[in-house]
């Protein structure tokens, strides 16, 4: 499948610092955040004009699920648009607090762990064909996902009883199973719950929940692009070396703690391989595969960055990727800070900086400041991101959903939508079922809109 439907779901961490004596719980802060949403959507679970879903998830975490995208840059742009949507809610909620005499600054973090050790996720969705064995896909994909922190981890300072240590991944310490149908209780690497949001006879949705939330656009593109390409190669019958892991959960933690990528992890049958060995195999197959694949500039950019990052890990010289890979950008920032102020990695100010890197408020968040200074690469523009806040992807089913929502809101009509249904809540209860996520034009939807 060379054209694939993809999406990213991001849960955001919430906290608030108060200026006066009045305090609010995280639940109350989250309700302030969503008050504007509830006022027009009559719910804290809504679909937006850009085709995305916005809702309040378990544990007071706002969650933004991008609309269906069919290109990498489109997906990165819509992922960033989610940050802008949440930032707008943040600014509105702070104003509401001020109007009610509760002075406070609300912080939304696009990260995966809080100070209490709780974890929240960034889930990737990939449409795959129903034909073929799902177990083959998961068997080949699992070693790739366990070791890809080397190329797309967000980085984290982990405080241990002995000392502070810099890790590749925020999420690695919180994953407890390889493949499972649960998402919250056991936190697997691949979630097998079969909800395709499409024609179930043709498709299923691969739900990857092991990834870190990335601030860097190029890291997001590498994370999603490399996984999509590995899936495409599996579907095309490309043969990979068998890197079945003896214990994926132990391996994911070991990989996260080794910035050199050279520490051996145990494979099934007593063999060993390093994260670098495993990633090199997938990368080498990708380079070969591209030679016969239909040209695609975005995929070629992904494979180029993938190779440069593996070279950087191998040589431990990160100069050629230090504006493109989250954990590398973050580690360089910490090292400069430590050198300038003569402090240890365990210093609370470093942990504060770690958190501030993920603050989505422009002008305050550290990543935003790095980006403005040219210390973090761009692959999209502010104008494209702003457009994606209100405009759905024009090449997928999201266009139909977005146009229906816009028309219904402008006509003052009551409606219900989900990923596959568009429904007018009138006497006739007219509903259109959109089972093909690749389809952006549908006469039935046009007629439904025209009838408003």
From Swiss-Prot:
Binding site for Mg(2+): 9, 55, 63
UniProt name for this protein: Pup--protein ligase
Organism, as annotated: Mycolicibacterium gilvum (strain PYR-GCK)
PANTHER family linked: PUP DEAMIDASE/DEPUPYLASE, PUP--PROTEIN LIGASE
Binding site for ATP: 53, 66, 419
Keywords: ATP-binding, Ligase, Magnesium, Metal-binding, Nucleotide-binding, Ubl conjugation pathway
Pfam families assigned to the protein according to its UniProt record, in alphabetical order: Pup_ligase
Ranges annotated as spanning the membrane: none
Domain of life: Bacteria
